[in-house]
Protein backbone atom coordinates (compact mmCIF):
# COMPACT_ATOMS: atom_id res chain seq x y z
CA UNK A 1 0.00 0.00 0.00
CA UNK A 2 1.25 3.51 -0.81
CA UNK A 3 1.38 5.75 2.28
CA UNK A 4 1.90 8.81 0.10
CA UNK A 5 -1.26 8.09 -1.89
CA UNK A 6 -3.19 7.78 1.39
CA UNK A 7 -1.85 11.17 2.49
CA UNK A 8 -2.85 12.64 -0.87
CA UNK A 9 -6.42 11.38 -0.48
CA UNK A 10 -6.66 12.54 3.14
CA UNK A 11 -5.37 16.03 2.32
CA UNK A 12 -8.50 16.90 0.31
CA UNK A 13 -10.90 16.09 3.18
CA UNK A 14 -12.62 19.39 4.18
CA UNK A 15 -11.80 20.72 7.66
CA UNK A 16 -14.81 22.62 9.08
CA UNK A 17 -13.13 23.58 12.37
CA UNK A 18 -12.24 27.18 13.31
CA UNK A 19 -8.60 27.30 12.25
CA UNK A 20 -7.56 29.69 15.04
CA UNK A 21 -8.53 27.08 17.63
CA UNK A 22 -6.95 24.09 15.90
CA UNK A 23 -4.05 22.37 17.67
CA UNK A 24 -3.86 19.19 15.61
CA UNK A 25 -4.16 19.16 11.82
CA UNK A 26 -7.07 17.22 10.36
CA UNK A 27 -4.75 15.30 8.03
CA UNK A 28 -2.69 14.12 11.02
CA UNK A 29 -5.76 12.98 12.98
CA UNK A 30 -7.19 11.09 10.00
CA UNK A 31 -3.83 9.52 9.13
CA UNK A 32 -3.42 8.38 12.74
CA UNK A 33 -6.96 7.00 12.82
CA UNK A 34 -6.69 5.07 9.54
CA UNK A 35 -3.32 3.55 10.49
CA UNK A 36 -4.53 2.59 13.97
CA UNK A 37 -7.72 0.96 12.68
CA UNK A 38 -5.77 -0.98 10.04
CA UNK A 39 -3.52 -2.18 12.89
CA UNK A 40 -6.57 -3.47 14.79
CA UNK A 41 -7.73 -0.57 16.97
CA UNK A 42 -11.50 -0.29 17.33
CA UNK A 43 -11.85 2.16 20.23
CA UNK A 44 -10.85 5.83 20.47
CA UNK A 45 -8.50 5.14 23.40
CA UNK A 46 -6.78 2.41 21.38
CA UNK A 47 -6.22 4.89 18.54
CA UNK A 48 -4.59 7.34 20.96
CA UNK A 49 -2.45 4.54 22.44
CA UNK A 50 -1.33 3.52 18.95
CA UNK A 51 -0.26 7.10 18.31
CA UNK A 52 1.91 7.28 21.42
CA UNK A 53 3.53 3.93 20.62
CA UNK A 54 4.23 4.83 16.97
CA UNK A 55 4.83 8.56 17.30
CA UNK A 56 8.30 8.59 15.73
CA UNK A 57 7.05 6.62 12.73
CA UNK A 58 3.98 8.84 12.35
CA UNK A 59 6.18 11.96 12.34
CA UNK A 60 7.83 10.72 9.14
CA UNK A 61 4.55 11.23 7.27
CA UNK A 62 2.41 13.74 9.18
CA UNK A 63 2.55 16.89 11.27
CA UNK A 64 2.64 15.67 14.86
CA UNK A 65 4.68 18.54 16.32
CA UNK A 66 1.99 18.97 18.98
CA UNK A 67 2.06 15.29 19.84
CA UNK A 68 -0.85 12.87 19.74
CA UNK A 69 -4.39 14.21 20.34
CA UNK A 70 -6.33 12.70 23.24
CA UNK A 71 -9.04 10.16 22.52
CA UNK A 72 -11.88 12.67 23.06
CA UNK A 73 -10.37 15.00 20.45
CA UNK A 74 -9.95 12.16 17.96
CA UNK A 75 -13.56 11.06 18.51
CA UNK A 76 -14.95 14.59 18.18
CA UNK A 77 -13.01 15.41 15.01
CA UNK A 78 -13.69 12.10 13.25
CA UNK A 79 -17.38 12.24 14.21
CA UNK A 80 -17.79 15.68 12.62
CA UNK A 81 -16.14 15.18 9.23
CA UNK A 82 -18.21 14.53 6.11
CA UNK A 83 -18.57 10.76 6.59
CA UNK A 84 -19.78 10.10 3.04
CA UNK A 85 -16.87 12.04 1.51
CA UNK A 86 -14.37 10.26 3.75
CA UNK A 87 -15.94 6.88 3.00
CA UNK A 88 -15.66 7.56 -0.75
CA UNK A 89 -12.05 8.67 -0.32
CA UNK A 90 -11.11 5.57 1.67
CA UNK A 91 -12.73 3.17 -0.81
CA UNK A 92 -10.99 4.86 -3.75
CA UNK A 93 -7.65 4.55 -1.95
CA UNK A 94 -8.23 0.86 -1.15
CA UNK A 95 -9.20 0.10 -4.73
CA UNK A 96 -6.09 1.91 -5.94
CA UNK A 97 -3.96 -0.25 -3.64
CA UNK A 98 -5.69 -3.52 -4.40
CA UNK A 99 -6.52 -5.03 -7.77
CA UNK A 100 -9.38 -7.52 -7.57
CA UNK A 101 -8.71 -10.63 -9.66
CA UNK A 102 -11.29 -12.91 -11.26
CA UNK A 103 -12.61 -15.66 -9.00
CA UNK A 104 -11.80 -13.90 -5.75
CA UNK A 105 -13.96 -14.45 -2.66
CA UNK A 106 -15.34 -11.24 -1.16
CA UNK A 107 -17.07 -11.60 2.20
CA UNK A 108 -19.68 -9.03 3.22
CA UNK A 109 -20.43 -8.82 6.91
CA UNK A 110 -21.57 -6.39 9.60
CA UNK A 111 -19.82 -5.39 12.81
CA UNK A 112 -20.85 -3.12 15.68
CA UNK A 113 -18.00 -0.79 16.72
CA UNK A 114 -17.22 -1.12 20.40
CA UNK A 115 -17.45 2.09 22.39
CA UNK A 116 -19.58 3.88 19.76
CA UNK A 117 -22.72 3.83 21.93
CA UNK A 118 -23.30 7.04 23.90
CA UNK A 119 -26.21 6.72 26.33
CA UNK A 120 -25.80 10.28 27.60
CA UNK A 121 -26.28 11.72 24.11
CA UNK A 122 -28.90 9.10 23.22
CA UNK A 123 -26.65 7.97 20.40
CA UNK A 124 -26.92 4.36 19.30
CA UNK A 125 -23.95 2.16 18.50
CA UNK A 126 -22.41 2.50 15.04
CA UNK A 127 -22.77 -0.59 12.84
CA UNK A 128 -20.48 -1.01 9.83
CA UNK A 129 -21.14 -3.28 6.84
CA UNK A 130 -17.84 -4.14 5.16
CA UNK A 131 -16.61 -6.00 2.07
CA UNK A 132 -13.51 -8.04 2.91
CA UNK A 133 -11.09 -9.56 0.39
CA UNK A 134 -10.14 -13.04 1.63
CA UNK A 135 -7.26 -13.23 -0.83
CA UNK A 136 -5.47 -10.09 0.32
CA UNK A 137 -6.84 -9.59 3.82
CA UNK A 138 -8.07 -6.03 3.23
CA UNK A 139 -11.39 -4.22 3.50
CA UNK A 140 -12.47 -3.02 0.05
CA UNK A 141 -15.28 -0.79 1.25
CA UNK A 142 -17.77 -0.21 4.03
CA UNK A 143 -21.06 1.54 4.75
CA UNK A 144 -22.23 2.83 8.13
CA UNK A 145 -25.70 2.00 9.48
CA UNK A 146 -27.45 2.95 12.70
CA UNK A 147 -28.46 -0.61 13.57
CA UNK A 148 -27.78 -4.21 12.55
CA UNK A 149 -31.35 -4.42 11.22
CA UNK A 150 -30.40 -1.86 8.56
CA UNK A 151 -27.89 -4.22 6.93
CA UNK A 152 -30.50 -5.19 4.33
CA UNK A 153 -30.53 -1.64 2.93
CA UNK A 154 -26.80 -1.02 3.49
CA UNK A 155 -25.59 -4.06 1.55
CA UNK A 156 -26.90 -2.84 -1.87
CA UNK A 157 -25.26 0.56 -1.21
CA UNK A 158 -21.96 -1.19 -0.56
CA UNK A 159 -22.30 -3.37 -3.66
CA UNK A 160 -22.79 -0.23 -5.77
CA UNK A 161 -19.40 1.07 -4.63
CA UNK A 162 -17.39 -1.97 -5.69
CA UNK A 163 -16.16 -3.64 -8.88
CA UNK A 164 -17.23 -7.27 -8.42
CA UNK A 165 -17.26 -8.83 -11.89
CA UNK A 166 -16.46 -12.57 -11.94
CA UNK A 167 -16.01 -12.79 -8.16
CA UNK A 168 -17.88 -14.78 -5.50
CA UNK A 169 -19.76 -12.71 -2.91
CA UNK A 170 -20.54 -14.39 0.42
CA UNK A 171 -23.11 -12.97 2.87
CA UNK A 172 -24.74 -14.37 6.01
CA UNK A 173 -28.47 -15.00 6.39
CA UNK A 174 -29.24 -11.28 6.78
CA UNK A 175 -28.28 -10.81 3.12
CA UNK A 176 -30.43 -13.63 1.77
CA UNK A 177 -32.79 -11.30 -0.09
CA UNK A 178 -34.00 -11.33 -3.71
CA UNK A 179 -33.00 -7.70 -4.26
CA UNK A 180 -29.47 -8.35 -2.99
CA UNK A 181 -29.08 -11.47 -5.13
CA UNK A 182 -30.30 -9.52 -8.18
CA UNK A 183 -27.87 -6.69 -7.45
CA UNK A 184 -24.94 -9.14 -7.34
CA UNK A 185 -26.05 -10.67 -10.64
CA UNK A 186 -26.28 -7.17 -12.15
CA UNK A 187 -22.64 -6.65 -11.11
CA UNK A 188 -21.72 -9.80 -13.10
CA UNK A 189 -20.69 -11.68 -9.94
CA UNK A 190 -21.76 -14.91 -8.23
CA UNK A 191 -23.18 -15.21 -4.72
CA UNK A 192 -23.12 -17.65 -1.81
CA UNK A 193 -25.88 -16.78 0.67
CA UNK A 194 -26.82 -18.44 3.95
CA UNK A 195 -30.42 -19.59 4.30
CA UNK A 196 -31.99 -19.58 7.77
CA UNK A 197 -35.36 -19.09 9.41
CA UNK A 198 -35.66 -15.47 8.27
CA UNK A 199 -36.60 -16.91 4.87
CA UNK A 200 -39.26 -19.35 6.07
CA UNK A 201 -40.46 -20.89 2.79
CA UNK A 202 -36.98 -21.10 1.27
CA UNK A 203 -35.55 -22.55 4.48
CA UNK A 204 -38.27 -25.20 4.57
CA UNK A 205 -37.67 -26.05 0.89
CA UNK A 206 -33.96 -26.57 1.57
CA UNK A 207 -34.65 -28.80 4.57
CA UNK A 208 -37.03 -30.95 2.53
CA UNK A 209 -34.74 -31.23 -0.49
CA UNK A 210 -31.52 -31.74 1.48
CA UNK A 211 -32.16 -33.82 4.63
CA UNK A 212 -29.06 -34.93 6.55
CA UNK A 213 -29.08 -38.46 5.11
CA UNK A 214 -28.76 -37.02 1.57
CA UNK A 215 -25.34 -35.58 2.36
CA UNK A 216 -23.81 -38.85 3.58
CA UNK A 217 -24.66 -40.60 0.30
CA UNK A 218 -24.55 -37.68 -2.12
CA UNK A 219 -23.61 -38.76 -5.67
CA UNK A 220 -22.65 -35.38 -7.12
CA UNK A 221 -19.73 -33.03 -6.46
CA UNK A 222 -19.11 -32.68 -2.73
CA UNK A 223 -16.48 -31.72 -0.17
CA UNK A 224 -16.22 -32.15 3.60
CA UNK A 225 -14.15 -30.56 6.36
CA UNK A 226 -13.66 -31.36 10.04
CA UNK A 227 -12.59 -28.99 12.79
CA UNK A 228 -12.74 -28.58 16.55
CA UNK A 229 -14.59 -25.44 17.60
CA UNK A 230 -15.77 -24.34 21.06
CA UNK A 231 -14.97 -27.74 22.52
CA UNK A 232 -16.84 -29.78 19.95
CA UNK A 233 -15.93 -31.54 16.72
CA UNK A 234 -17.71 -30.10 13.70
CA UNK A 235 -18.11 -31.78 10.32
CA UNK A 236 -19.14 -29.53 7.45
CA UNK A 237 -20.49 -31.06 4.25
CA UNK A 238 -20.61 -29.08 1.00
CA UNK A 239 -22.43 -30.20 -2.14
CA UNK A 240 -23.04 -28.78 -5.60
CA UNK A 241 -26.60 -29.08 -6.90
CA UNK A 242 -28.62 -27.72 -9.78
CA UNK A 243 -31.26 -25.15 -8.86
CA UNK A 244 -34.73 -26.68 -8.95
CA UNK A 245 -38.08 -24.81 -9.10
CA UNK A 246 -38.85 -25.15 -5.38
CA UNK A 247 -35.66 -23.24 -4.55
CA UNK A 248 -36.49 -20.25 -6.76
From Swiss-Prot:
Signal peptide: none annotated. It holds the Pfam family DDE_Tnp_1_assoc. This is Putative transposase YncI. GO terms for biological process: DNA transposition. Belongs to the transposase 11 family. PANTHER family: H REPEAT-ASSOCIATED PREDICTED TRANSPOSASE, PROTEIN YBFL-RELATED. It comes from Escherichia coli (strain K12). Missing up to 50 C-terminal residues compared to orthologs. One of its GO terms (molecular function) is DNA binding. It comes from the Bacteria. Keywords: DNA recombination, DNA-binding, Transposable element, Transposition.
